Amino acid sequence: MRGGNGLQIHVVKQGDSLYSIASTYGTTYDAINVANELDNPNQLVVGQSLVIPIVGQFYFVQPGDSLYSISQRFGVNVQELAEINNISQNQPLEVGFRLYIPEIPEPTIEVNAYVEPTGNTVSETLENSAQKNAPYLTYLAPFNYRITREGELIAPPLNNFASIAANNNATLMLVVTNLEEGAFSAELGRIILTNETIQNNLLNNIIETAQQIGFRDVHFDFEFLPPENREDYNNFLRKAKERLSTAGLLMSTALAPKTSATQEGEWYEAHDYAAHGEIADFVVLMTYEWGYSGGPAMAVSPINPVRDVVEYALTEMPSEKIMLGQNLYGYDWTLPYVAGGEYAKALSPQQAIILARDENVAIEYDQEAQAPFFFYTDDEGNRHEVWFEDARSIQAKFDLIKELKLRGISYWKLGLAFPQNWLLLEDNFTIRKRG
């Protein structure tokens, strides 16, 4: 399976070893091991997807393929494809024949990643994750500055985030929320959006904080607002945009994943896609949590529902304002699902693969959702269902970004190990740096 230009995605089959895979692609054991950060390279999991670092990429001919159809798929001139593979343009291709696909130009996108410290400190693991992945980021977004009911700001621990961003030419994003006592507060949102004095105090504090610390984008993540405050939110954003632009700051917003302007539900109704698309410099669509910790087991960000949200957004705003939200986590559900019962446990893609290996189960792949999953039984006899992300699922999102010419991608959140994502991101795109 193709990745971008210089990576191939290989799904481990029964009998595969890292040595045999390396031989197939003309690379080395060490190169694959390092790229995928394998903790036990001699114990692969059937169904595990690996990224294979090569220059250009290989494609294995499928039934019904012709050289012309393959050249169209990859955007490569058919004559160039024939010449580089030493074959005739009109030569019938055998199924399984390996073609070399030369590199093609990469689209340029922006990349954001939220980073969420817990408690009053930034863990060493989280800071290391920010340091490691900042080269791939346009924006680094510490989550979050909470608002008081008087319009003051309560800062998160920042540690070295500002210097990490500066040293990697990434823009620091100031994330402002209506979180109160650990949950999004409709009442706090109502107070802020209906009181001009508090709004003015809040905007003064935001601008002062941004200038002191070096934030260059202000990102409003106001959720679960009262539906009757929809237009109040729009008016607040208009005022904020004017103030922030005068101060030389960008402004962005986070939007619940809607598929129509009239979608009902407390998460959706106060979010006006058309207004945000008009006012903000860009938006982040929160296109994840179809599978969530308190719900039934399913893919966290299945490709078709994600596409539905983006296609609706495109009817309300230009593609160059849309950042696709992407989870860096999966969930482990205990079966059977019972409403109000035990919450699913979050885990990283790397943790999911290790869990499948330890439980000696194969990883399956849902072609419709474009997501990997597996089942296992724990030591107490409880059945589990795990959905997560892998190289194939993230490549499907990258292909959607390219197809719909979106501004970029926004990750929730750093600190979850998924090395294949960052390699494929760099392989598929040129990442814009704002400096």
How should these model regions be labeled?
Residues 203-232, 282-296:
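Active-site groove signature of glycoside hydrolases
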Residues 1-25, 48-75, 99:
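Primarily a LysM-type cell-wall glycan-binding module
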Residues 178-184, 188-189, 330-397, 429-435:
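Glycan-binding loop/region signatures in secreted carbohydrate-active enzymes
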Residues 149-153, 231-235, 239-356:
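Substrate-binding surface in catalytic domains of secreted glycosidases
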Residues 111-115, 138-142, 172-176, 218-220, ...:
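Hydrophobic faces of well-ordered beta-strands that scaffold small-molecule active sites
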Residues 104-201:
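Glycan-recognition patch characteristic of GH18 chitinases/ENGases
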Residues 397, 403-435:
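Acidic/aromatic/glycine-rich contiguous surface patches that form carbohydrate-binding/processing clefts
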Residues 125-148, 205-218, 400-409:
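Catalytic domains of carbohydrate-active enzymes, especially glycoside hydrolases
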